[in-house]
Amino acid sequence: MCQKNILFLVADDLRPNLGSYDGANDGIFKQPPMHTPNIDALASKSLVFEKAYDSMALCSPSRTATLTGRRPDTTRITRIGYYWRDYGGNFTTIPQFFREKGYWAVGAGKVFHGGPSSGNDHIMNCDCDYSWDVCPYHDPPDGYPESGDVSWKALDKATLDEAPLQDQKNTKWLLPKIRDAAKKFKEEDTPFFVAYGVHKPHTPW
């Protein structure tokens, strides 16, 4: 039986108003669907989950819960800056599981919460020793003040061309890796697990 290749996409602070979900249509929160043609096209030929539950309304605990399949009370991660393998247990992650099944695992961007939350002081370290064949690329943005309250709308194309943000840099790094993964699959029959975590629509920093 041929193993399927896997593309695992993570968005940061994305609302549920996607066209593929017909907007947020639950009572008082009903809003019109956003214009999301690319996601909708992907959803039309994908398995779309219609029930999802937030384990915790904080980045690192919720990512840890998603990637390990365990609740924050099990991982013991309820805030940012703590590594679940040190506090909760040596739990297997989604990319680690596929890697152990023979998949080639590579990622870029904000998949895990980088830095101390993933076992290292550096933002680039994202559980590298366990989960990946190639340590994910997650580079900080160039040439911007460290500000968490600036909209993406404040950044024009000329500015972004001169000083790319993380999503642009991560995409540029990951595309050749996806080509390598496709080549390995074709020549060696090695399936791949590719994860990409975008910062949009979170504020750019």
Task: Annotate the PLM regions.
Residues 1-205:
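Formylglycine-dependent sulfatase
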